[in-house]
Curated annotation (Swiss-Prot):
Active-site annotation: C51 (nucleophile), C54 (nucleophile)
Gene3D superfamilies in UniProt: Endoplasmic reticulum resident protein 29, C-terminal domain (1.20.1150.12), Glutaredoxin (3.40.30.10)
GO BP: cellular response to oxidative stress; protein folding; protein folding in endoplasmic reticulum
Source species of the chain: Schizosaccharomyces pombe (strain 972 / ATCC 24843) (Fission yeast)
Annotated site location: Lowers pKa of C-terminal Cys of first active site: R116
GO CC annotations, alphabetized: endoplasmic reticulum
Disulfide pairings: C51-C54, C170-C173
Descriptive protein name: Protein disulfide-isomerase C17H9.14c
PROSITE patterns named among the record's database cross-references: THIOREDOXIN_1 (PS00194), THIOREDOXIN_2 (PS51352)
Catalytic activity, EC: 5.3.4.1
Length: 359
């Protein structure tokens, strides 16, 4: 017996979207079809890519999705309602993030208005579906310390270390938790930066030693001056914390964990690179000699790469365009390893210093 076409499409879509914990939906039509396919209901996050609160919610929502991943009849989904304005219009989305529960019987959707932590969201979905779940502990990108290992980790003179001193009962700490977890994820590929935390209520000796008077307290321990940690007094948003660490550690991370477009760039070489493609071959030869001389004074990896690019362009002007296109394609692959992504992004940044409009 053949299934009606619509039923087949919905079935196929249903099987596809539940392949991962949180389903990223791409259109109003896909959203509605997927909701209809959810036999026990659907929780949808309407978000915007620029929204700081959405970024803070992301790790919590991913954990929620993982928790219900093995229940194919429940949908934990999300859609960019800023890009898909027809979605925002239909569901009257006026702020981000907005979480809405869609009952399986097609009755009136319910906007979620409770706390945005894993426990509260899990309880909400469990009440709506009848599926009882316990919170699962996902691998963390933030190192949890105690009295025994605090000095070994924090006082490592090869690493800049950001420490959150927290207490379990502290409401502000709970609100900071998803942001701090994301912060750990952003910097997990930085070999000289560590994002850590310690329960200074339980390990009160550490709290007293470091003059922790309230929770959460965040301190930065620089690798070159461990005896003078700096109290972080800025905004506790993800963007502000990233900006702070980038400034203190010389890192160049963006909120999604990728490198900024300035990573790897060297101003001295950029000055030559900006005009190199338009120069005559004779002028290029002169510049290349200057670059080689500078490279003798600085043998760092990216200095060598600049030199290589100058040499490649001298032999083939089209090489820089082809190589930039190749690296861009590699960076779009979702399965790319973090270390490879950093390497490709830095190379692409340097190549862009040669290309018109990217200086």
């Amino acid at each position: 017996m053949r299934l009606p076409l619509l039923s087949f499409v919905i079935f196929a879509l249903f099987a596809l979207v539940f392949a991962s914990g949180v389903v990223e939906l791409q259109s109003l039509n896909e959203l509605e079809n997927t909701i209809r396919a959810s036999k026990k209901g659907a929780l949808i996050e309407f978000y915007a890519t620029w929204c700081g609160h959405c970024k803070s919610l992301a790790p919590v929502y991913e954990e929620l999705g993982a928790l219900f991943e093995d229940h194919n009849d429940v949908l934990i989904g999300k859609i960019d309602a800023d890009t898909h304005s027809d979605v925002a219009d239909k569901y009257h989305i006026t702020g981000f993030p907005t979480l809405i529960w869609f009952p399986p019987d097609g009755s009136e959707p319910v906007q979620y208005s409770n706390a945005r932590d894993v426990d509260s969201l899990t309880q909400f979905v469990s009440e709506k579906t009848g599926i009882k779940k316990r919170k699962i502990v996902l691998p963390s990108n933030v190192v949890e310390l105690d009295s025994l290992n605090f000095d070994k980790v924090v006082m490592d003179d090869k690493k800049d270390v950001l420490v959150e001193f927290y207490a379990d009962w502290c409401g502000y700490c709970k609100r900071l938790a998803p942001t701090y977890e994301t912060l750990g994820k952003v910097f997990k590929n930085e070999p000289n930066v560590e994002i850590v935390k310690i329960n200074a209520d339980v390990f009160a000796d550490i709290g007293r030693l470091h003059e922790v008077a309230s929770f959460p307290t965040i301190k930065f321990f620089p690798k070159d001056d461990k005896d003078k940690p700096e109290l972080y007094e800025g905004d506790r948003s993800l963007e502000s914390l990233i900006e702070y660490i980038n400034k203190k550690s010389g890192t160049q991370r963006s909120p999604d964990g990728t490198l900024l477009s300035t990573a790897g760039r060297i101003p001295t070489f950029d000055e030559f690179a900006a005009e190199f493609l338009d120069m005559s071959n004779a002028a290029k030869e002169v510049v290349l000699e200057k670059v080689k001389q500078l490279a003798l004074e600085d043998s760092s990896r990216w200095t060598k790469y600049y030199k290589k690019v100058f040499e490649k362009i001298l032999n083939d002007e089209n090489w820089v365009h082809k190589e930039a296109k190749r690296l861009s394609k590699l960076l779009r692959q979702k399965s790319i390893a973090l270390a490879s992504a950093d390497d490709f992004k830095t190379r692409l940044n340097i190549l862009n210093s040669f290309l018109p409009g990217n200086h």
